[in-house]
Every structure is written in structure tokens, then in C-alpha cells.
């Protein structure tokens, strides 16, 4: 972990823009066409615009901001999107700002304060036409202009959504000046996005970093280590499957997760 930054005395407003973008994937197996249809309907209801608004509202609470406007929409045949504009906090409340490179809070605590932000989410349910694999993706972006890193909301979002594979990008852009006129291109310590995650999260996932430190650009990929096949089955359980079927389904799920994690199609081994 890097040494924490000393607090900067700024000339005017903090003009740094910090953006957290990540895609969360939930993967399952549905054996029949009817089960795949029911999975899409389940996901569409589970992650409706109303529920996503509630989740993002919790994010706003975590970062200590105020909602200015909410735009939300459910789509046909499936999918939803929500965008929230957030107001800045009074200057006197910013004195409790925590810049440490450490995990952010879960939804039962509020520890950070925000200057300006927008938060948005889009969902993409889909199913393979004939091999039973179904994948739900949620794209989320939290962008702030000010002193607070949106990484403080990361833990809550990972725990709020069913996350089998996660890809995360964090970047800091622009600069802010101190009282001597010196430009600063980042105002907090960070060596890895992983340092903003709790230990239970790090233990549950296989992770890989690709960071470009000189560009203030950080990237982390996560893949769940879960081995219980029942957690990936929709509308059936392992009791309904033969040993051969279990092995085949497990192979399909593993392949799907690895292809998403590595961002490329794997060659057939047959």
C-alpha cells in the first residue's frame, strides 16, 4: 500500500475527475428453452429500473451526496437503465474526507462526502440460443468531480449484484492546483483497485490487475472461485442431473466465465 497523501491546500475548487466503470456478469445454466425464457424474465424483474434506482440510491448515501434528478427506463423485450445526477456537499462537511487506500463501506455505514457526481447503470440480459448458458451483464459508472474517489462505493455494488465475473476500470483525469500554483494530477494514494475491497471479497475471487500508473489508469478483473454447481443452475438442481450432465454443464459454465474474464474466445478442445 502506498504512503497516504498529505492533505492538499487547494487554490479554488478541486478539478480532478475520477471515474469508476465496471461490468458485472451473472452466469447461469438453464436447460430448456422455457427455463431460459423464465431466467430472462426473472432477471428483468430482479433488476428492474425501480430496484436499480434503489441500489444507486444506496450508493448516493454511501458517498454522502444529494440526489438532484433521476432518469430511469425499463426496455422491451428486456433490460433497464438508470441515471442519477448528484449535488455537491457543503464545503464545511468535506473536512471528514478519507483519502486512504482502503476498502469502502458496505451499505450499513456512510463515511464519505462528495462534490459532484453522476451515477448510471445499464443492464443486458441474454441467453445462448441452444447450449443453455445465460449471461446477465450490468454496466455501472460512478463519476465524481471533486476530492472523493468513487471507489468507496465499490464494495456495496459488488455485494448488491450477483457477481460471477467483474471487470473494473478506474481513472483520474484533469488536474487541480495547490495554493502555490503547482498542478496535481491525482490527490490520493492508489496502487491497485484491490486495496479498496474487503478481505472476504478478495478471498472469493481470482483477480488480475493491469495498471498504467503514469497515466493514473487502473484495471482489475475478477472471477468467482465458487465451486457449487447448484448456484449456477436455474430451474433445476444437481439432483436432476446425471454425472455426465453435471460434468458437461460445469465445463460450459467454466468456459463462459473464462472467456469473459480473459476477454477472448477459447479454442475448442474436441
Swiss-Prot record:
Gene Ontology annotations of biological process type: spermidine biosynthetic process
Entry-linked InterPro entries: AdoMetDC_fam_prok, S-AdoMet_deCO2ase_bac, S-AdoMet_deCO2ase_core
Family stated for the protein in its record: Belongs to the prokaryotic AdoMetDC family. Type 2 subfamily.
HAMAP family tied to this protein: AdoMetDC_2 (MF_00465)
Keywords recorded for this protein, A-Z: Autocatalytic cleavage, Decarboxylase, Lyase, Polyamine biosynthesis, Pyruvate, S-adenosyl-L-methionine, Schiff base, Spermidine biosynthesis, Zymogen
Pfam families: AdoMet_dc
UniProt EC number: 4.1.1.50
Positions of the catalytic residues: 117, 122, 145
GO molecular function: adenosylmethionine decarboxylase activity
Biological role: Catalyzes the decarboxylation of S-adenosylmethionine to S-adenosylmethioninamine (dcAdoMet), the propylamine donor required for the synthesis of the polyamines spermine and spermidine from the diamine putrescine.
GO cellular component: cytosol
Enzyme kind, highest EC tier: lyase
Reported modifications of this chain: Is synthesized initially as an inactive proenzyme. Formation of the active enzyme involves a self-maturation process in which the active site pyruvoyl group is generated from an internal serine residue via an autocatalytic post-translational modification. Two non-identical subunits are generated from the proenzyme in this reaction, and the pyruvate is formed at the N-terminus of the alpha chain, which is derived from the carboxyl end of the proenzyme.
Pathway: Amine and polyamine biosynthesis; S-adenosylmethioninamine biosynthesis; S-adenosylmethioninamine from S-adenosyl-L-methionine: step 1/1
Protein name: S-adenosylmethionine decarboxylase proenzyme
Top-level lineage group: Bacteria
SUPFAM superfamilies assigned: S-adenosylmethionine decarboxylase
Cofactor binding note of this UniProt entry: Binds 1 pyruvoyl group covalently per subunit.
Record site feature (Cleavage (non-hydrolytic)), residues: 116-117
Transmembrane segment boundaries: none
Quaternary state and interactors: Heterooctamer of four alpha and four beta chains arranged as a tetramer of alpha/beta heterodimers.
Reactions performed catalytically: S-adenosyl-L-methionine + H(+) = S-adenosyl 3-(methylsulfanyl)propylamine + CO2
Natural source organism: Pseudoalteromonas translucida (strain TAC 125)
Cofactor section: pyruvate
Residues annotated with Pyruvic acid (Ser) modification: 117
